[in-house]
Amino acid sequence: MTTFCRVLLIFGIYVAVCCAQSVEDDVFHFTNPSQGNAVWILDESSLPWTGGYQFLRSISGMPTTLLSVVDSSTGVTLGQCVAPQDATGNFSKRWERFSWELTASGLDCTFEHGAAIRVEFDRTQNPRTFSIRIQSITGPACLRDVVVQTEQATGCPPHLSRNSFTANALNCSCPFLDAANEDSEIENEDVDMLANTPQFPLFKGIDPSVLGSANPPTLPPSPCANHECHNNGTCLVSQEGAATCLCRNGFTGDRCELDVCSSVPCQNGGVCRSNNGIAYCECPPAFTGLLCESAHTDESVAPICRPECSNGQCVFKDGQAQCECRQGFTGANCNVLDVCLGDAACSMFGPLAKCVLDDNMDKMSSLTLINGTYDCLCPHPIHGQFVDCMQLHAPSATSVQPTEQVVINNVTPSFPVLEISKLPTGAPVTFTATSTTLMVTQPTVTVSPTHQVPSEPFVGFTVTRAPLRPLDIGSTTLPPPFNQHIITAGEPTWSSQQPHQPSEVPTQTTFIFPQTPETTTFAPTTGTQQPVHKFVSPSVPDENEEEEEEETTEETEETFPTPSTMQVATNGQFTTETAFVTSTIPSTTTDMEETDEDEDMTEEVTDSSTQPSTTVFVQPTTTFTTEAPTTTMEEEEEMTTDQVEDIESEEIATTTTQTSLPFWMTTTNKQVVPDSPTPMVIMPHPQPDEKMETSTEGVVDEESDEERTTVPESNEEVVTKNAEATTPSDITHHHTSSGKQSSAAASWIIAIIALIVLGLLLLATSLFILRYIRQSRKLHGKYNPAREEHNLSAAYAMPMSHIAKEERLI
């Protein structure tokens, strides 16, 4: 019995809570008394539109406005359903029934006890869109049983699936539910459901006497109570709480007190109209003009429109010639596209947004077809009126945080901006003094003496980098066809050079790509000047040159003949040396190894020292063995003979030297000024039988002998005053390429060992798994304890066949 009572108790509690919840979910009220509303937006295609609900009158004592219909395009209130006063002076607290029916011509309001009101709308030729509103300012205190087009609102907050609406501050429950005096017994039971709930220790209900004695909350007076709007204007409360007047068409002012047509005297029966605060006269068909002061001429004459109609026809309209535009066009001469056709221009703001052309588009005249300007209007979520969508979706001005002003300073680029410049065609001239600068893979590279070992093939050189500095460019003369490929950096030119003491020694560099012999001369300059760098674009080698190179290729080496020139000053005079540089590359060298060597050279170039002075050291007694290409010896001899004849007239010795360079070549102009604090260069005149040798990264390249051309008139050696020109013998050469090969071999060995160890581990794991499987099968598959016991007993038992029949019977 006790268990049955407990079950009944729990069931009663559940029923009471469910009933209370259903009552609360079926009753609604506006939590914001000043801005709460529910808005539907309709067009004429949705009419007739019906609905209804039960309501409690407004607690303010003013007439309760149950429904308002506003023209969305103009904001004019077309009609309202106001609850009639009762005997209690609108203070009756009981549920009342209200229903409505909206048509294109008017609004029908029906109240209980048969009371009905009909509100007629002003006729218009233009299609209308309606904004139907239930507002909390003077609206009902609570609502329930809301039905629209036979669909009842459900949920909390309420919603309709087929007749959706936008609501603001509309929530479930009603704080005045206990004070409502219902007439019917069913309504009394619904209202007193919470009051008559059984009282249990854990669920104590609310005492009805407490709710009945509580004073209803008082609302502050509306700002529109003391704000009167004239000429049938509508008072609205803004978001800031200020009262504003929404004026009818034709009136303006803070309180709609100004009539825009009062100062426009239309003549000859014309009627003053206004559009957005602008008054104009609507003239009868027989008159025209600003004030309808002019009579029309004979309309039988074909109308002539000025300017001519582009996308329409000229017709008489209201007594004057006007352009009647086709669909999709507007303007005075129908040359303005109606971009609002179909409202696709404002579709990004939602389905309720509409596109409206500017007012002056119908009067705009254009000789060419242009797009019309428009505005996107969206219904305001509070009062439902159409406002600018950009202002509606833009953030409030008060929510914008101040940001710091970004100051952009002029930033000097860290790279040279190159441009193609025209080269002068004047005669080449020599310069006073120069130093040697080489360009490898960085924008600018300088050559300076150091005890660090450079990368192959720059033996005895240290390549350094320095900050970029603007420099001036001198004139340059190059033989065709390479002069059109010179890229100069304009003024100023950005170059990389360490700061050094002022001197009259400008530095000049020419960068020549493979197979491009080049000679560059510069005009003499004085004063402090930084090195200027020239870049020569690579030229495509001829097929004949490639064939000649293939003919001179042997089994063990490959030669690339690349002539270059060098100028050296001797006792204040200039000596020009013409060197035919031949680079030998072993036949076993691959492209990948060449790339590795280039990368090693680039890395050492980056890490080298940055001394400002630049000097090339040449060993006087060194020997160099190489093999000159047989196909180019005659050309070399002719070139050398021509240069010797020119040099003999100037008493300058010409010597042919050779050095080891990479597949590109460098034309270097070197001059040494006597009494200069920088180290000088000694360029001896080697004898025909002498040999020169150079070391590149500790590897000596052995090459075949080559004939050397010397001038018999000059047998003296060049002696400098301030420095010895011998190559430093304490330079330590590094085997960069061999080091990389050894590291690669070590990597392969480690990888092979790792693979072997991994294979052994896999083999051991496989053996372990196989052994486990065999043991598992033996234990779980073939092994049977009963069978084993039987076999064991049979083995030790005496066979019955050896026992006599009599003994077996016993």
UniProtKB/Swiss-Prot annotation:
Protein topology in the membrane: Single-pass type I membrane protein
PROSITE patterns: EGF_1, EGF_2, EGF_3
SUPFAM superfamilies: EGF/Laminin (SSF57196)
Pfam family, one: EGF
Signal peptide: 1-20
One CC-aspect GO term: membrane
Main location: membrane
Cytoplasmic side: 770-810
Tissues where the protein occurs: Highly expressed in the pharynx, circumpharyngeal cells, pharyngeal-intestinal valve and a subset of neurons in larval and embryonic stages. Also moderately expressed in the lining of the intestine, coelomocytes, labial process bundles and some hypodermal cells. In adults, it is predominantly expressed in the pharynx, the pharyngeal-intenstinal valve, some circumpharyngeal cells, m3, m4 and m6 pharyngeal muscles, and IL1, OLQ, BAG and ALN neurons.
Glycosylation-annotated residues: 90, 171, 232, 371
Disulfide partners: 224-235, 229-245, 247-256, 261-272, 266-281, 283-292, 305-314, 309-323, 325-334
UniProt region (Disordered), positions on chain: 522-567, 684-738
Phenotypic effect of disruption: Worms display a reduction in pharyngeal pumping rates, body length and intestine size, as well as a prolonged egg laying period and smaller brood size.
Cited SMART domains: EGF, EGF_CA, FOLN
Extracellular-side positions: 21-748
Biased composition (Acidic residues): 542-558
Domain EGF-like: 220-257, 258-293, 301-335
UniProt entry keywords in alphabetical sequence: Disulfide bond, EGF-like domain, Glycoprotein, Membrane, Repeat, Signal, Transmembrane, Transmembrane helix
Record field: transmembrane: 749-769
Top-level taxon: Eukaryota
Keyword Transmembrane: yes
UniProt keyword Oxidoreductase present: no
Segments of skewed composition (Low complexity): 522-531
Entry protein name: Abnormal pharyngeal pumping eat-20
Organism expressing this protein natively: Caenorhabditis elegans
Lineage of source species: Eukaryota, Metazoa, Ecdysozoa, Nematoda, Chromadorea
